[in-house]
């Protein structure tokens, strides 16, 4: 009986230590979410401005730019999958990968090859475990992405988009990431990045109609300069949204783990007390039995 009590004490001690760790990680994630949301908000003015600029150029010109022209036949699609580097975030990465699997199945059903580009060690481990190939992978800092990483990703995707199919190029680019809606709601999302669909944002109201411009130098040169910046901004925005979603998911997961640890501590405490009472009862019974034996 005494050994059983010691086991419960050890379980209570270890679970209490784990609860402290969960609480610390929850507080860290909570503090970082505010910074992540602020970065998302800070990126919006630039993203909106460059989106308006690209829309103005593309809608007011009749040129066939490679990044805005729909190919006659789409044979290979690139899929950029943004996950996390670390775990302890609930089903965050699993949800993104499930969404990516659904997109991959859809593209295969349309007769398209799929070329994967991965962000985050979770996506890399997922593909490695299944012996599936991928073109590129970027790891490190998924919960605090840097614009330089988005530039590198954008450059790699644009390079393959500009390459012929026979040389391993792609005809369209999709991005799978988690959109941050609120602290309790994050939604796995798919967007098609290229070829650029000019009318892909919500329709502007009459007061927001784009004015007419005359472009210097030529419109094609303006697009050549703007579109890479536009692609980088869209990728960076997706990475920032994913980072905020990852931290929110981790905060919820750690809170849930802490609550479960509290329940376990209560359970083990109750079992320990029951075992202690049983031990005391047994000792009293032995004392009474011994006294009766002496009296007789």
Curated annotation (Swiss-Prot):
It is a peripheral membrane protein. Keywords: ATP synthesis, Cell membrane, CF(1), Hydrogen ion transport, Ion transport, Membrane, Transport. SUPFAM superfamilies: ATP synthase (F1-ATPase), gamma subunit. Transmembrane segments: none annotated. Pfam families: ATP-synt (PF00231). InterPro entries: ATP_synth_F1_ATPase_gsu, ATP_synth_F1_gsu, ATP_synth_F1_gsu_CS. It is found in: Cell membrane. GO terms for molecular function: ATP binding; proton-transporting ATP synthase activity, rotational mechanism. One of its GO terms (biological process) is proton motive force-driven plasma membrane ATP synthesis. Its main location: membrane. PANTHER family: ATP SYNTHASE GAMMA CHAIN, ATP SYNTHASE SUBUNIT GAMMA, MITOCHONDRIAL. Produces ATP from ADP in the presence of a proton gradient across the membrane. The gamma chain is believed to be important in regulating ATPase activity and the flow of protons through the CF(0) complex. F-type ATPases have 2 components, CF(1) - the catalytic core - and CF(0) - the membrane proton channel. CF(1) has five subunits: alpha(3), beta(3), gamma(1), delta(1), epsilon(1). CF(0) has three main subunits: a, b and c. Belongs to the ATPase gamma chain family. This is ATP synthase gamma chain. It comes from Paenarthrobacter aurescens (strain TC1).
């Amino acid at each position: 009986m005494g050994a059983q009590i010691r086991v419960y004490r050890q379980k209570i001690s270890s679970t209490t230590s784990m609860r402290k760790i969960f609480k610390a990680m929850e507080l860290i994630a909570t503090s970082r979410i505010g910074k992540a949301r602020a970065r998302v908000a800070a990126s919006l003015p630039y993203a909106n401005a460059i989106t308006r600029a690209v829309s103005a150029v593309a809608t007011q010109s009749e040129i066939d730019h490679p990044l805005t022209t729909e190919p006659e036949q789409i044979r290979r699609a690139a899929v950029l999958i943004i996950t996390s580097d670390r775990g302890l975030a609930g089903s965050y990465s699993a949800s993104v990968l499930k969404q990516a699997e659904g997109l991959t199945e859809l593209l295969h059903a349309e007769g398209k090859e799929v070329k994967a580009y991965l962000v985050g060690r979770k996506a890399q481990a997922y593909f490695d475990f299944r012996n599936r190939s991928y073109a590129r992978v970027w790891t490190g800092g998924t919960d605090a992405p840097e614009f330089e990483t988005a530039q590198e990703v954008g450059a790699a995707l644009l390079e393959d988009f500009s390459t012929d199919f026979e040389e391993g190029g792609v005809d369209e680019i999709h991005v799978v990431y988690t959109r941050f809606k609120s602290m309790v709601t994050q939604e796995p999302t798919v967007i098609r990045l290229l070829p650029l669909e000019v009318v892909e944002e919500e329709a502007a109201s009459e007061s927001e109609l784009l004015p007419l411009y005359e472009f210097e130098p030529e419109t094609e040169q303006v697009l050549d300069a703007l579109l890479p910046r536009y692609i980088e901004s869209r990728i960076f925005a997706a990475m920032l949204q994913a980072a905020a979603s990852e931290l929110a998911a981790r905060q919820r997961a750690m809170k849930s783990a802490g609550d479960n640890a509290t329940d376990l501590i209560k359970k083990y405490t109750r079992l320990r007390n029951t075992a202690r009472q049983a031990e005391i009862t047994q000792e009293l019974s032995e004392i009474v039995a011994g006294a009766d034996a002496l009296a007789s």
